[in-house]
Amino acid sequence: MSLEEKKTTESKEKDKALSLVLGQIERNFGRGSIMRLGDASRMKVETISTGALTLDLALGGGYPKGRVVEVYGPESSGKTTLTLHAIAEVQKNGGVAAFVDAEHALDPVYAASLGVDVENLLVSQPDTGEMALEIVDQLIRSSAVDLVVVDSVAALTPRAEIEGEMGDHVIGSQARLMSQAMRKITGNIGKSGCTVIFLNQLRLKIGVTYGNPETTTGGNALKFYASVRLDIRRIQTLKRGTEEYGIRAKVKVAKNKVAPPFRIAEFDILFGKGISTTGCLLDLAEETNIIIRRGAWYSYEGENIGQGRDNTIIWLDQNLEIRNKVESMVKEKLTEGTEVSSNSMKALNSNPANTIAVNDIKTVA
């Protein structure tokens, strides 16, 4: 037998052995327990829109389905608002969303003003961290829920701490709880296609002289299991005269397993109204030269449409036909691969690391 014939025989024997073991694994653990990556029905990760076009671009399409997402930041930075917009987007597409309100602070009136269908939103206000995470696990395993939001990790108080007295030290109990929960639910999340968003608070590490003293609550498990981590900050207060009407938020993609990380997105959050979608559109329209800015004036097709950013946003909201036309043109240019800075601010476009080509990422959901 020649060397070539020997190799062919060995290859056939290996293929036969592989087929046998794959069949045995599927009989023991069920269909789909092991597969070739090329046989997967969904090679591309589907996404849920964040409600902000600039953030969708920074994330590579939006929140990935079937993954864990962590959103953290200081108080009043827009964390809950960001997730309520995601819930509204899921419901708009006929999906089911759940909100686990561990902080007992959900405002249904505000949620409704952001477009959330509060009548059909599943809400739980658990008494303990164990109860909250068990509810999350059961919702995921049902495969009937598309999005679960947990607000927040810091409020997931272990039962031992609740049943104890004030001043009792239960060291590491919350970290152990989160570590066990992440081990348990991560596999179910991938199988069900449900996206789970954990909101988290910031704390300061004591005695840190060099480096960043900030850290998130709940230990390190969530940092490892999360496919996407978003750091949201309030960078500016929006004012008309002395009246404050919103904030400018900056989101850094601190971790992303499904698209390039470290991109930055900025957008306006208006009090009582949520993310300014028209503001995001104007930022991108300006960068793609669909709307031209000269000094304080913005012009479209050679005609001035507003003096100042706020007046231009109001004009676009009042002229929906032109707004929709501008939106279509922006999306067309982005699909063609027009480059925009990930934070949609020309002043920061001087850093090439902030620049992304939209045809290199998934289509915005």
Curated annotation (Swiss-Prot):
A GO CC term assigned to this protein in UniProt: cytosol
Principal subcellular localisation of the protein: cytoplasm
Molecular function, one GO term: ATP-dependent DNA damage sensor activity
Keywords assigned: ATP-binding, Cytoplasm, DNA damage, DNA recombination, DNA repair, DNA-binding, Nucleotide-binding, SOS response
Residues that, per the record, bind ATP: 73-80
Localization: Cytoplasm
GO biological process: DNA recombination; DNA repair; SOS response
A Pfam family it matches: RecA_C
Domain of life: Bacteria
Keyword DNA-binding (UniProt): yes
Family in the record: Belongs to the RecA family.
Function summary: Can catalyze the hydrolysis of ATP in the presence of single-stranded DNA, the ATP-dependent uptake of single-stranded DNA by duplex DNA, and the ATP-dependent hybridization of homologous single-stranded DNAs. It interacts with LexA causing its activation and leading to its autocatalytic cleavage.
Protein known as: Protein RecA
Organism: Prochlorococcus marinus (strain MIT 9301)
